[in-house]
Regions:
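Short, flexible loop segments at boundaries between secondary-structure elements
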Residues: 185-191
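A short, well-structured juxtamembrane/interface segment
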Residues: 1-12, 25
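Acidic-glycine-rich active-site phosphate/pyrophosphate-binding loop
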Residues: 17-36, 62
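Thiamine diphosphate
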Residues: 3-8, 32-64, 69-185
Length: 191
């Protein structure tokens, strides 16, 4: 399965959740599959989807146990193996902050798909073992879970999902919004 099909599969479960998507082709593919105001399409900042997702999750997490629309939304981050390897410090920060509304999904194709499919070191590293070593309690291989059930359950911790995919980019169109339009539409919807 390639990333396009993986994103399509996951987006069938997404209703009101906020989605932050990695740069380049992943964002283009998400845009083609299911464009909506609650999708934040990253443009030009490789490695930072997990950090942006963490910031949103911390802002929306329930701090005092109350649940309302403004602070209990789940944040789903679509990231890539190359981006996670560029910013591995974000994994330690996510673990230590542990927002209980963050789901980080790493599409691992073993390459930098948006820059020409150069190999990443993820081919030699077990990312699930890395996050377990950091201390994540809820980390899964996508093939071993029912994502719909994961999404429905009340989280006790941040969740890490490793999604092994084949290299390849869909022939998805360029996003026809400027960065300012993406930001403004997103913020208007989530605030």
């Amino acid at each position: 399965m390639e990333r396009f099909d993986g994103i399509k599969d996951i987006m069938e479960y997404i209703t009101d959740e906020i989605v932050v998507c990695n740069i380049g082709f992943p964002s283009r593919e998400l845009y083609q599959i299911k464009d909506r105001a609650k999708n934040f399409y990253m443009l030009g900042s490789m490695g930072l989807a997990s950090s942006i997702g963490l910031g949103l999750a911390m802002a929306k997490d329930t701090v005092d146990g109350t649940k309302d629309k403004n602070n209990s939304e789940k944040i789903i981050v679509f990231d890539g193996d190359g981006s996670v390897l560029m910013n591995m410090g974000s994994l330690a920060t996510i673990f230590n902050q542990n927002p209980k509304n963050l789901i980080l999904i790493v599409f691992d194709n073993g390459c930098y798909g948006s820059t020409g499919n150069q190999c990443t070191y993820a081919q030699n590293i077990d990312l699930l073992e890395v996050v377990k070593g950091i201390g994540f309690k809820d980390c899964y291989d996508y093939e071993d879970i029912d994502f719909g059930e994961i999404l429905k359950k009340e989280q006790k911790n941040s969740i890490f999902i490793h999604y092994k995919i084949l290299p390849g980019n869909a022939d998805s169109p360029i996003i026809d919004m400027s960065p300012d339009e993406i930001r403004d539409r997103f913020l208007e919807d989530i605030i």
